[in-house]
Amino acid sequence: MAKIYKFLVSVFFLIIYGKIKIGKLRDVKTIDLKYKSIYKFKLYILKKGRIFTDCVTNVAYIQNNQIIPKISYQQNKHYISSIKYNSTLINGTPKFKKYYRGKVLSLVQGASGNNYWHWLFDIVPKIELLNANKILKKIDYFYVPNINQYVVDTFKIFNINKEKLIESQTNKHFEADEIYGLEHLYIKKGAFQKQFKNLPKWIVKFINKKFLKFKKK
């Protein structure tokens, strides 16, 4: 019975939002970012884009019903997987979407973003990249895994109010005028637990410099 219900829901939303296909990076606008004049990254901008997430193993960045590689995230049996395994290619986007006017920076990556360590070493460096490139103040909303106290406190350090935060747990599907996204800074492919050896030294140095001064004595 549960399978039949899930199938009917999938068909219903497929009629509303359409089928998702794999897109190409060349169809997405990018901005080159630098950090300390050494490290280079790309910021992807989706015009009238959508994001769908299950808040566990899949995040889909969608433009014109095409899922965008590199910034989309999918995990299959504890492995970081190819875009072809993203659940939206099979199930579509089975949630009603909300619409946000303005620019939204996405900071979600499945379930790991709910963990404080991952928030600190995976997500916060992305905020700093936009800050260092003078783009952070142009963002209207920030799409985050959850809105708990350490998330709110982090954004206070960057002078960003709680009112600008969008929680993924209650907003699994949304569209915006512009969606900004970065690919994961060091997790690429393979077993999830083996990725942390790739943690860049610049991230560790940045975290120490930015947050140690707030340590309670």
Show where each model-derived region lies:
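The feature primarily captures lumenal catalytic ectodomains
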Residues: M1-K217
